[in-house]
Structures are given as structure tokens and as C-alpha cells.
């Protein structure tokens, strides 16, 4: 039964998106997991806690005995059936626990008794996690070109279309602004970092990569923050700035934040609840910058937002949103970005409209 335990093995698992059957407790999995992992725990949270207390009070033998007592009979068979089904569905997968210790070996032995030989990760999640951290440190040393520009300039799409681009906002499941949330909840910080490392490893492995193309992000993307090693390199990177006409930017923002988000919410929740979720999403975004707008201006824009939502609900038109979006861009987002860009003006090496920046990036 082949085990995987070298640095190159760990990297190969991440590059190949190898299915991982993670047998840690749900609370451990939620704190951090690998991108291709599914959680089928040997013990649930309560069982794990009880075994942990027993270990501290009575030692390892007593804890092991308690674990076997808690996971026995029908419960044990149900879990074996779930692991067996996952193994059959993912014949090239691998087992994983916290450190490649007793839990994954117990599951491996029970599966063997059930007629399935399945490898495990020696070193477990901890070894994979260290590999992800080290890979990010190493790969961040390659040169970086940042794509900058005001809100609505299509920076994310430009990055997505580059073979050496990494969509940080897509990985973070957040678009990096007050209105940046998506319908997918953000990952834990460790899971986000693991996903980023896997994406960088895959991108680097599939081409002769000379430099990274990333969006000009702040340290935080929603609740996730960029790894310090990557953030430090980004502060030293050259910047290409997209400068599209205001009208083009408005078209993009209308498509992304009004048409698409309304569609996504109604698709996920149905027409009635989806509409309420969509309205709450827009109001929450505006409310998040209330202090910076000032109470009077916030109240004015919130009233315009309400009017625009009423128009959209009755006519289907999103044109009414321009009444609050345009001043929000002109008075808040654009001045804020230009101020930030002025502080790193010496790093700007190219300016142009979207297509011009895309061509310039390809030539690098």
C-alpha cells in the first residue's frame, strides 16, 4: 500500500487536485483544509472532545479504548460505509488526518478489512499545510505585475484571461469592496491560503512561468488576508493601470452588481426571498461605508437606492441605480483609489484602456 510522504509527493497531490478523504473532526476541518478534501470524520466534535479529555486525564491507552467504544457498532459501520463509498467514487484519492497518526491508520485498517486498500498521507494535514506555506513563499519570489484601475475597469477579468494570472478575489470568494461579498461564504484563513498555494503550484507547473499577473489588492479581501510573503512582494511590484471611459465602467458595474447579483440571489433563494436577499446585499454594502460618506450623504444615497430598487422590482430596469452609483464612484471610490495610486506612482509602468493593458501584459 503506497504512502505519500515526500515534499514532492505533497506538491504533486495539490497540483493534481487529488481527492483527499479527511477524517479529522468537523471543527478541525473548518479551521483549515486542503482544496480537494471532503470531510468524513472518524469522530465527530463531541467524540473527539471526550477522547481528548480522557487522554489528558488517563493517558493514551484509555483514550484509544474510549474512542473505540464511542465509534462502535452501527455508528462504526455507517462511517465505514461512507468511507467505502468515497473511496469507490475517488479511486485515486488518499486518506488524511491531522498528522498521519492513529486516526488515518485506523480508518485505513478498517477499510482494508472491508476489502479496500487505500493510501494515506504520512504527516497528514500538517505536512500538507507546511508544503502549502513553503510553496507560497517560494513562488512569491517570481516577478509580479499588478493590474490596477478604478472600480469597474474589468481588472479581475483581465487577470482571469492571463495564463499566468491568479484571481485572488475569486479564490477569496470576495470582490474586495463594501459590495464585494458573493453567495459563497468565504473560507477560513488557512483554507484560503491552501487554495491559493494550490492554484499557484498548478499555474507554475503547467507552463514556463516567468512572472505573475495579479490584481492590485489591499491586504484584506473581505475577511481573508493575503499571506505576508505575497503581500510584501506585491508592494514592490510594477503596476499596469486600466483607464476605461466612465460609461464603460458603469456598464460593467451594472452587469456585475445589479443584473448578475439579482440573478444569483433569485436562483439560490427563489424570486421572493432572492429579492429580499438582493436588497439586503446592496443596503449592507452602502451601510458599510456610512461613516466615510457622512450621515447626511449616506441617507441621500440610501433613499436613491430604495427608489432604484422599487423601479427595478416594478419595471425590471436597473437604470435607476445610476442615481446613487455615479455619486458613490465620483465622491468615494474614485478619489480613494486615485489617492492610493498616487502613493505608488513610481511603480506605474503602463496606462491604457482594457484592451491596451491586456496586450501589454501579454508582451511581458
Swiss-Prot record:
Domain annotation Rhodanese: ranges: 14-137
Source organism superkingdom:
Bacteria
Q: Which InterPro entries match?
A: P-loop_NTPase (IPR027417), Rhodanese-like_dom (IPR001763), Rhodanese-like_dom_sf (IPR036873), SelU (IPR017582)
- According to the record, the segments passing through the membrane are none
Q: Which reaction does it catalyse?
A: 5-methylaminomethyl-2-thiouridine(34) in tRNA + selenophosphate + (2E)-geranyl diphosphate + H2O + H(+) = 5-methylaminomethyl-2-selenouridine(34) in tRNA + (2E)-thiogeraniol + phosphate + diphosphate; 5-methylaminomethyl-2-thiouridine(34) in tRNA + (2E)-geranyl diphosphate = 5-methylaminomethyl-S-(2E)-geranyl-thiouridine(34) in tRNA + diphosphate; 5-methylaminomethyl-S-(2E)-geranyl-thiouridine(34) in tRNA + selenophosphate + H(+) = 5-methylaminomethyl-2-(Se-phospho)selenouridine(34) in tRNA + (2E)-thiogeraniol; 5-methylaminomethyl-2-(Se-phospho)selenouridine(34) in tRNA + H2O = 5-methylaminomethyl-2-selenouridine(34) in tRNA + phosphate
Q: Name one GO molecular function term.
A: transferase activity, transferring alkyl or aryl (other than methyl) groups
Catalytic residue list: 97
| UniProt family annotation | Belongs to the SelU family.
Q: Which NCBIfam families match?
A: PRK11784.1-1, PRK11784.1-3, tRNA_sel_U_synt
What is the name of this protein? tRNA 2-selenouridine synthase
Organism whose genome encodes this protein: Escherichia coli O6:K15:H31 (strain 536 / UPEC)
Cite the source lineage: Bacteria, Pseudomonadati, Pseudomonadota, Gammaproteobacteria, Enterobacterales
Amino acid at each position: 500500500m503506497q504512502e505519500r510522504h515526500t515534499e514532492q509527493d505533497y506538491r504533486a497531490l495539490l497540483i493534481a487536485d487529488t481527492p483527499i478523504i479527511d477524517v479529522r473532526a468537523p471543527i478541525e476541518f473548518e479551521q483549515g483544509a486542503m482544496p480537494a478534501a471532503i470531510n468524513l470524520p472518524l469522530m465527530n466534535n463531541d467524540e473527539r472532545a471526550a477522547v481528548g479529555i480522557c487522554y489528558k486525564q488517563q493517558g493514551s491507552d484509555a483514550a484509544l479504548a474510549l474512542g473505540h467504544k464511542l465509534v462502535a457498532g452501527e455508528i462504526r459501520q455507517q462511517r465505514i460505509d461512507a468511507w467505502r463509498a468515497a473511496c469507490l467514487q475517488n479511486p485515486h484519492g488518499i486518506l488524511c488526518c491531522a498528522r498521519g497518526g492513529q486516526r488515518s491508520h485506523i480508518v485505513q485498517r478498517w477499510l482494508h478489512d472491508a476489502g479496500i486498500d487505500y493510501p494515506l498521507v504520512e504527516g497528514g494535514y500538517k505536512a500538507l499545510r507546511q508544503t502549502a506555506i513553503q510553496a507560497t513563499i517560494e513562488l512569491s519570489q517570481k516577478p509580479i505585475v499588478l493590474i490596477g484601475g478604478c472600480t469597474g475597469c474589468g481588472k479581475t477579468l483581465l487577470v482571469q484571461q492571463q495564463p499566468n494570472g491568479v484571481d485572488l478575489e475569486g479564490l477569496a470568494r470576495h470582490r474586495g469592496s463594501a459590495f464585494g461579498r458573493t453567495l459563497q461564504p468565504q473560507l477560513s484563513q488557512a483554507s484560503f491560503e491552501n487554495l491559493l498555494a494550490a492554484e499557484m503550484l498548478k499555474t507554475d507547473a503547467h507552463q514556463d512561468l516567468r512572472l505573475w499577473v495579479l490584481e492590485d489588492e489591499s491586504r484584506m479581501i473581505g475577511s481573508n488576508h493575503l499571506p505576508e510573503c505575497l503581500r510584501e512582494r506585491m508592494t514592490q511590484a510594477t503596476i499596469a493601470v486600466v483607464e476605461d471611459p466612465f460609461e464603460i465602467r458603469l456598464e460593467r458595474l451594472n452587469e456585475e452588481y445589479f443584473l448578475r447579483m439579482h440573478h444569483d440571489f433569485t436562483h439560490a433563494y427563489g424570486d421572493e426571498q432572492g429579492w429580499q436577499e438582493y436588497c439586503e446585499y446592496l443596503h449592507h454594502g452602502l451601510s458599510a461605508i456610512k461613516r466615510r460618506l457622512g450621515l447626511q450623504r449616506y441617507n441621500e444615497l440610501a433613499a436613491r437606492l430604495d427608489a432604484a430598487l422599487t423601479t427595478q422590482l416594478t419595471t425590471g430596469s436597473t437604470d435607476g441605480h445610476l442615481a446613487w452609483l455615479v455619486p458613490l464612484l465620483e465622491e468615494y471610490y474614485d478619489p480613494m483609489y486615485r489617492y492610493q495610486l498616487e502613493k505608488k506612482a513610481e511603480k506605474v509602468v503602463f496606462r491604457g484602456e482594457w484592451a491596451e493593458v491586456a496586450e501589454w501584459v501579454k508582451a511581458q
